[in-house]
């Protein structure tokens, strides 16, 4: 007979994900145990296994849910009928808002994905690649000379992406700069230089 799920199954499952993300962000995946996750949830270890059989399953679901939601939000941001620069602003604002509001999950994604089995890690990387590709498309519209349609991603998208993802190792949304202002600063810092950039190779070294 198939077991009937309780009405609050999804809520309890999400609560476990939230508590585990906070624990992993603070102590690291490797330094945390399922017993500690259960204690953080105010539940028994056996109760936890009703939702997640292994710690790796818990880690995968934390990063999968986080990055899938982020991808959905970013697709909405860049698919609006707006000029490319405005869609770029929306992309950065959306990325910053998600990172600021899901800082634990973001840190777990950055620091602990290496502990996932290969197949699950590849699945997460594919989602990350789609997020970067959205950015590449918008940057191509802003400055096709620097981002030719048939070229590889190039340094520009990855420079910006790297800058944004590492922001949340130090940024706290409760600090002096709110997320929306931070996003505007990032957008302006990057796009004003990128839009007018014409690449000139450095002069040969005399050494």
PLM feature spans:
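Hydrophobic alpha-helical connector segments
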Residues: 61, 75-101, 157-160
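Amphipathic alpha-helical segments used for helix-helix packing
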Residues: 100-119, 169
